């Protein structure tokens, strides 16, 4: 094991000693009570069984032999990634019945597509939807008639929200069930070029729509390596879904057997089975360190610098951005998938996929292999890939010995970068996250005068008017969680990329977020404290020189007398329309981004 990995893990363990102990005590108390169905009244149980088939009723009455598994689904028709889930509940119920168990559709959770809301007002609900999903999952599980969970979610806020809630029911086992990415359409690189041409006024809306629909063209996850596919990587490297199941296309012959196997596996992990493995005991500080390593090694979405601290807190584990920063110094970048390269997630899968990646990281001493997973003790089952044997049965075989495409997936001894894809920046503006995996090395440092904006529209208007045709640090404030829910600002990427390609030194500094698909332009995002809460970002003025330095982890305003500038009251921001007024309470409660931007909790 790499000594720094051990140091970071121990630091997290010590920091979390009290909160983790309290969490485990709560979980162990629930485990000791045994299956809750035995404690419910006959009237309670009759209500639960009422709509079940006669066969299911017979199974459910056999408490000591048959498990009742909750199915929580984030299906809707809007998300292409979740479209395959439409028929999953019946598939899972059938697989469970074949094992002598019952599955009940316990609840549906909301799931919004950030691609649909990007640049729109609805994006201000995106981050909070994670916590709403956690609450919705808790409501579904509150019936207390279940012995385990099957969690159906893929996209940006859905997986973190499901996992956060599942950890609060940590006395039960849980298995995530993926659906896979859509087949490749036009390349993400070609799509980005059309977006830049549209931002420059060189092509019209019809050409842009044609390009977008050629990229996002069928059921399945978007093929770039954004937050959705980062979610899938994380669930696999954390051992929460079946080995090799993340990136199998929806219509691949492997997909249905993997779905059935997930149902069978969760039934084998309940308290009614010999291999009982409650989620709360499975996910510990080692699991979360593995998650951070995976994120850094793949150049994953910066959104997880927010989600992982939130997930950790649900299990009593306290993650700090410094943990990620320290790991980034020793974890190499092993993948080149858009926006970190030209390939898509299907090319990653074809090059060797998760089994090769995890084996390489483990061989370099960069993963805890002694963790618990849904496959049992140890991470070794995840160094294998699924296939259908000669009898058509689902089996696993060792990962490929060598990467099948070294331009997409590199071995640990010859990485694309010697350090990870994410950096922590610190200075007199506070703390911020910078994704470096997609930024050319000569763009990691920018020192230029600031132009301060409070809306995305104002930035784009200045771009169209030629006001940003210079070396510039675009400062966009009042985009933090308390201000307006911390929307993603991906619509700025084509314009800023055009400026960068025109030869200007350009950077973005904001307390907002960027899409997992972003990354070509150097950006200090998630600035904490946020401007609306009195952070130093609110005191930056036009013309202040700002230094953003990914090499040395610096974010500094160089203006004389900056430290003496007084704070001032933030403006009253519009928060009505598209349901935003319903989230006013969450904006008041939400914690800073570096603490997970949590609007739910009990502290």
Residue spans for each PLM region:
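Catalytic or ion-coupling anion/metal-binding cores of large enzyme and transporter domains
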Residues: 1-77, 81, 90-109, 120-122, ...
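Acidic/charged coordination and interface sites in well-structured regions
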Residues: 87
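N-terminal small/polar loop signature for handling phosphorylated ligands or for N-terminal nucleophile
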Residues: 106-144
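N-terminal glycine-rich "phosphate-gripper" loop used for MgATP/nucleotide binding
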Residues: 130, 152-155, 352
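Contiguous domain-boundary segments centered on the initiation and propagation of an alpha-helix
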Residues: 130-137, 144-148, 460-468, 475
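A short, small-residue-rich loop immediately preceding and capping a beta-strand
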Residues: 141-162, 175-177
């Amino acid at each position: 094991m790499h000594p720094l990995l051990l140091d970071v893990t121990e630091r997290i363990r010590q920091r979390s000693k009290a909160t983790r102990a309290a969490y485990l005590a709560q979980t162990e108390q629930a485990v000791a009570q045994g299956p809750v169905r035995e404690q419910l009244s006959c009237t309670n149980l009759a209500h639960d069984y009422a709509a079940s088939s006669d066969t299911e009723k017979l199974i459910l009455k056999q408490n000591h032999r048959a498990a009742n598994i909750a199915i929580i689904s984030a299906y809707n028709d809007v998300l292409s990634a979740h479209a395959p889930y439409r028929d999953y509940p019946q598939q899972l119920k059938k697989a469970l019945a074949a094992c002598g168990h019952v599955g009940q559709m316990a609840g549906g959770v909301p799931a919004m597509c950030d691609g649909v809301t990007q640049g729109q007002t609805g994006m201000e609900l995106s981050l909070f939807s994670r916590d709403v999903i956690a609450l919705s999952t808790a409501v579904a599980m509150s019936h207390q008639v279940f012995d385990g969970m099957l969690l159906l979610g893929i996209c940006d806020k859905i997986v973190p929200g499901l996992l956060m809630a599942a950890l609060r029911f940590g006395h039960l086992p849980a298995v995530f069930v993926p659906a896979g990415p859509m087949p490749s359409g036009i390349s993400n690189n070609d799509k980005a070029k059309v977006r830049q041409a549209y931002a420059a006024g060189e092509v019209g809306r019809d050409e842009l729509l044609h390009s977008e629909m050629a990229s996002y063209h069928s059921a399945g996850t978007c093929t770039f390596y954004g937050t959705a596919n980062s979610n899938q990587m994380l669930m696999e490297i954390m051992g929460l879904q079946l080995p090799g199941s993340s990136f199998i296309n929806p219509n691949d012959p492997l997909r249905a057997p993997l779905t059935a196997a997930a149902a069978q596996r969760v039934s084998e992990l309940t308290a009614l089975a010999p291999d009982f493995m409650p989620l709360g005991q499975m996910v510990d500080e080692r699991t979360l360190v593995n998650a951070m390593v995976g994120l850094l090694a793949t150049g994953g979405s910066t959104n997880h610098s927010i989600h992982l601290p939130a997930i950790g807190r649900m299990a009593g584990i306290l993650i700090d951005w410094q943990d990620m920063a320290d790991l980034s110094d020793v974890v190499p970048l092993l993948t080149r998938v858009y926006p970190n390269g030209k390939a898509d997630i299907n090319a990653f899968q074809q090059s060797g996929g998760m089994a090769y990646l995890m084996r390489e990281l483990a061989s370099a001493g960069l993963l805890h292999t002694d963790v618990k997973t849904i496959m049992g003790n140890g991470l070794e089952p995840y160094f294998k890939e699924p296939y259908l044997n000669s009898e058509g049965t689902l089996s696993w075989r060792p990962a490929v010995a060598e990467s099948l495409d070294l331009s997409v997936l590199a071995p640990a001894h010859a990485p694309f970068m010697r350090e990870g894809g994410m950096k922590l920046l610190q200075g007199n503006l506070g703390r911020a996250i910078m994704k470096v995996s997609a930024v050319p090395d000569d763009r990691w440092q920018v020192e230029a005068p600031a132009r301060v904006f409070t809306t995305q529209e104002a930035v784009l208007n200045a771009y169209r008017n030629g006001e940003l045709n210079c070396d510039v640090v675009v400062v966009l404030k009042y985009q933090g969680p308390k201000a307006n829910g911390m929307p993603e600002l991906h619509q700025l990427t084509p314009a800023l990329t055009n400026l960068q390609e025109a030869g200007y030194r350009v950077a973005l500094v904001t307390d907002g977020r960027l899409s997992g698909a972003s990354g070509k332009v150097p950006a200090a995002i998630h600035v904490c404290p946020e401007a609306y809460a009195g952070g130093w970002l609110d005191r930056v003025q036009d013309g202040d020189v700002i230094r953003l330095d990914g090499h040395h982890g610096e974010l500094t305003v160089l203006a004389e007398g900056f430290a003496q500038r007084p704070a001032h009251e933030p403006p009253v921001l519009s928060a009505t329309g598209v349901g935003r007024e319903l989230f006013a309470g969450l904006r008041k409660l939400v914690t800073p981004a570096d603490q997970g931007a949590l609007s739910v909790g009990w502290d």
